[in-house]
UniProtKB/Swiss-Prot annotation:
Residue ranges annotated for the PLA2c domain, each copy included: 35-590
GO cellular component assignments: cytosol; endoplasmic reticulum; extracellular region; fungal-type cell wall; periplasmic space; plasma membrane
Function (record text): Catalyzes the release of fatty acids from lysophospholipids. Phospholipase B may well contribute to pathogenicity by abetting the fungus in damaging and traversing host cell membranes, processes which likely increase the rapidity of disseminated infection.
Glycosylation sites per record: 33, 45, 78, 82, 96, 127, 164, 177, 219, 281, 349, 392, 493, 517, 545, 569, 605
Lineage of producing organism: Eukaryota, Fungi, Dikarya, Ascomycota, Saccharomycotina
Gene: PLB1
Species in which this protein is naturally found: Candida glabrata (strain ATCC 2001 / BCRC 20586 / JCM 3761 / NBRC 0622 / NRRL Y-65 / CBS 138)
Gene Ontology MF terms: lysophospholipase activity; phospholipase A2 activity
Protein name: Lysophospholipase 1
Main subcellular localisation: secreted
Localization of this protein: Secreted
Keywords linked to the UniProt accession: Glycoprotein, Hydrolase, Lipid degradation, Lipid metabolism, Secreted, Signal
Length: 659
């Protein structure tokens, strides 16, 4: 389709046939013992990229080179100083491959709203989308090296990546199929609609799968249930929603092995029961097809995702030559990044639902949280006895028997930027797709960027840099939350930082042809609603199909080349100067209190002393890397049966629909 016209032209989505042969060793949701090398060590220090990622990048760089050069030439072809643009592109794509810009894309959380609106934004960058080259940014996705997702954004990135790198175009064109991806016409609690037998059977299967894992001796929580339920919507052609499908299986998919797609990265936060996480102290975990871990000084380690569930000490299996495989179920890891249960508990007082329902929901969800059931349990802890934690930091993460992970946006960083701004990944530009519901009307207000910027001044942000951004009042008052905005346009203003961070292209969800500001907890969408939100996302990412600014695609090209152009002291086309005037935040501040936005806490007035205060607050090393020894070693498990699960999800859904 042209997403703005919704024209069906593409063949139906093929079944997954990308050469995957791994799957769970039990062909079920239950992990199992497998043999592994006697000298294997599953842990490494976070001092650089893994060798697996380095080797994969060599192949990806070959593919992105041609795609990016083609994209840049196309979007700058209408520059009056075309020769200047061509010369710059030729210089960047000379024999020295280190001069070629590297791109990352980050899709925010926000439930199905973020998944669908983010899908529209990503489709605008995909040359497989009809009309994306003419009316959008087609080819940009093919030129990207990384694609990060969090919560609802993670549902998007996982759907595309683990369905043989399918396209949003294909998904939309296949909506009439019996086994259509993203068929969310019925709530996750009642997938059969009026067909109660289908609903009952679905929940029996979910209950059986999770109960079997529990009987095998593995801890389970509602994250297992949540992930299993979601999987049916994202992998409908696979047996029971991919009950045996693994995160590490992507390594064996031809489209990934050949680096024909960006590397997907998902994000979650570390949290122990009884603690809270904020932007300054959270331990941000990332998981790629190769590894799970964190760059943060509270852990500074990565482990092989394929052998999660193995009992280890400093990365060495407790039993020589024996590991666990099958723990990394794709639904479980996908559900880990989107544990909406505790997200609702944290934000319920900010909702407008009736007080008596709020009190009931708070009581119900508080009981869940106190029982630790809202947390994804990774046990045994893959980082047990890890020796890479900063000496000035609590070692709770490595001393605990269990690793607890929650929704990646719980620390306020709802756009998963942390993995993409690491110096080791050396990106020049990151596209931040923000579909958060920050304001009272469920639009973004830049809070996520504010939190990521602020984090660099705390202990956990050591060694990470991020360009200056304003607070939420300024975002709203200047309208920065209603159109694409560039941050960090001039590297000369950041020479005092440890390294020059990527330029950030902020693309917020905003109203164009459809009200895409649905509630995070809206659990069902009609086909009309799905297509409306996707279409609006396409328009938000393209300045309304380039009708609001016919030069917008060229400006994106300028932004992509900016870091390398400055580093190499090359001549910039004059059109790029105009672009930067129009789209770069120029430092203007407007602290007038804006209605219904995330509190900035006088963020716009922050100075060096404020940053020092932030660092001081973080020095205690509390929150995600601390708790009482009783809580951090508490066994966590849910008594699983179909009736209990159905009752829990039904009650949650009834409340969510009132938000």
């Amino acid at each position: 389709m042209q997403l703005q016209d919704l024209v069906v032209t593409v063949s139906l989505l093929a079944a997954f046939n990308g050469g995957v042969e791994a799957w769970s060793p039990t062909n079920s949701y239950v992990p199992a013992n497998v043999t592994c090398p006697n000298d294997i060590n599953l842990l490494r220090n976070a001092t650089g990229l893994s060798q697996s990622e380095i080797d994969w990048l060599k192949k990806r760089d070959v593919n992105t080179r041609e795609a990016l050069e083609s994209f840049l030439k196309r979007v700058t072809s209408n520059f009056t100083s075309n020769s200047s643009a061509s010369n710059l592109i030729d210089q960047l794509f000379s024999t020295n491959s280190s001069n070629i810009p590297k791109i990352g894309i980050a899709a925010s959380g926000g439930g199905y709203r973020a998944m669908l609106s983010g899908a529209g934004m990503v489709s605008a960058m995909d040359n497989r989308t009809d009309g994306a080259n003419e009316h959008g940014l087609g080819g940009l996705l093919q030129a990207a090296t990384y694609l990060a997702g969090l919560s609802g954004g993670n549902w998007l990135t996982t759907t595309l990546s683990w369905n043989n790198w399918t396209s949003v175009q294909d998904i939309v064109d296949s909506q009439d199929n019996d086994s259509a991806i993203w068929d969310i016409s019925h709530s996750i609690v009642s997938p059969g609609g009026i067909n109660i037998f289908k609903t009952g059977s679905r929940w029996d299967h979910i209950s059986d799968a999770v109960e079997d894992k529990q009987k095998a001796g593995f801890n389970v929580s509602l994250a297992d249930v949540w992930g299993r339920a979601l999987s049916y919507q994202f992998f409908p052609t696979l047996y029971r929603g991919g009950v045996a499908y693994l995160w590490s299986d992507l390594r064996e998919s031809d489209v990934f092995k050949n680096a024909e797609m960006p590397m997907p990265i998902s994000v979650a936060d570390g949290r122990y029961p009884g603690t809270a996480v904020i932007d300054l102290n959270s331990t941000v975990f990332e998981y790629s097809p190769f590894e799970l871990g964190s760059w943060d000084p509270s852990l500074s380690a990565f482990t092989d995702v394929q052998y999660l569930g193995t009992k280890v000490s400093d990365g060495k299996p407790a039993e020589e030559g024996k590991c666990i495989a099958g723990f990394d179920n794709v639904g479980f890891l996908m559900g880990t990044s989107s544990t909406l249960f505790n997200q609702f508990l944290l934000r319920i007082n900010d909702t407008s639902i009736p007080k008596f329902i709020r009190n009931l929901a708070t009581h119900f969800l508080k009981d869940l949280s106190e029982d630790y059931d809202d947390i994804a349990v990774y046990a045994p802890n893959p980082f047990r006895d890890a020796d890479y934690v900063n000496n000035n930091r609590s070692k709770s993460l490595s001393e605990s028997e269990y690793l607890f992970l929650v929704d990646g946006g719980e620390d306020g960083q709802n756009v998963p930027l942390v993995p993409l701004i690491q110096q080791e990944r050396d990106l020049d530009i990151v596209f931040a797709l923000d579909n958060s519901a920050d304001t009272e009307e469920n639009w973004p207000d830049g809070a996520s960027l504010m939190h990521t910027y602020r984090r660099q001044f705390g202990f956990q942000g050591q060694g990470v840099t991020f360009p200056s951004v304003p607070g939420t009042d300024t975002f709203v008052n200047l309208g920065l939350n209603k159109k694409p905005t560039f941050f960090g346009c001039d590297a000369r203003n950041m020479t005092d930082l440890e390294y020059i961070p990527p330029l950030i292209v902020y693309i917020p969800n905003s109203r164009h042809s459809y009200n895409g500001n649905t509630s995070t907890f809206k659990l069902s969408y009609s086909e009309k609603e799905r297509l409306g939100v996707i279409r609006n996302g396409f328009e938000a990412a393209t300045m309304n199909n380039l009708t609001a600014d016919s030069n917008f695609a060229g400006c994106i090209g300028c932004a992509i080349m900016r870091r390398k152009q400055q580093a190499l002291n090359l001549t910039l086309p004059k059109e790029c100067e105009t672009c930067f005037t129009n789209y770069c935040w120029n430092g203007t501040i407007d602290n007038t209190p804006a209605k219904g936005v995330t509190a900035s806490n006088d963020f716009d007035n922050a100075s060096g002393s404020a940053a020092a205060d932030m660092a001081e607050q973080d020095a205690s090393g509390a929150a995600s890397a601390s708790s009482s020894s009783r809580k951090k070693n508490a066994a966590v498990s849910v008594d699983v049966n179909a009736k209990t699960l159905f009752a829990i999800i039904t009650a949650m859904t009834a409340v969510f629909q009132l938000i």
